Amino acid sequence: MKKKVLAIALVTVFTGMGVAQAADVTAQAVATWSATAKKDTTSKLVVTPLGSLAFQYAEGIKGFNSQKGLFDVAIEGDSTATAFKLTSRLITNTLTQLDTSGSTLNVGVDYNGAAVEKTGDTVMIDTANGVLGGNLSPLANGYNASNRTTAQDGFTFTIISGTTNGTTAVTDYSTLPEGIWSGDVSVQFDATWTS
């Protein structure tokens, strides 16, 4: 009888042990978008970005991807105007890492092969000198109409420089700290109607 009880106890112990189960592994991330809404159909010049920028580091090229940033331009015509000029100038372009490292990235902006810089204006349209704006040409044709004219075009955005701590420049982006950088890239547009 003792042997039977012992055998049943052993079977129960081995059955209770079972095979080790692998635990499920899950991960979760949250993406957050800043959101605002604005409508302006009365200003002489309205420029609206059509999307946002998201740069991703690519290990294979040890760099960040470039982005095409589209924008919409609307102008109010001036029937007394004989010429029209539209220029752009870079205002802000620094992204800062969201930790305590102080690491920064600078974003370069290019319009049809010309750098948009903080130190001077980039001419996009200048009807007096035959610069008709490529994709923005509807503005060059409608600046002296009695209604509003719109056109769309885009900038090319690239990461042009970075620092590990806000001061120490990097030449190899693979040496940047891991993390997320955030900030604004702002471009000022100036329109001039000449009468």
Curated annotation (Swiss-Prot):
The lineage of its organism: Bacteria, Pseudomonadati, Pseudomonadota, Gammaproteobacteria, Enterobacterales. Keywords: Fimbrium, Signal. The gene is ecpA. It comes from the Bacteria. Belongs to the EcpA/MatB fimbrillin family. Induction: Negatively regulated by H-NS. Positively regulated by IHF and EcpR. It is found in: Fimbrium. This is Common pilus major fimbrillin subunit EcpA. Its main location: other. Part of the ecpRABCDE operon, which encodes the E.coli common pilus (ECP). ECP is found in both commensal and pathogenic strains and plays a dual role in early-stage biofilm development and host cell recognition. Major subunit of the fimbria. Residues 1-22 form the signal peptide.
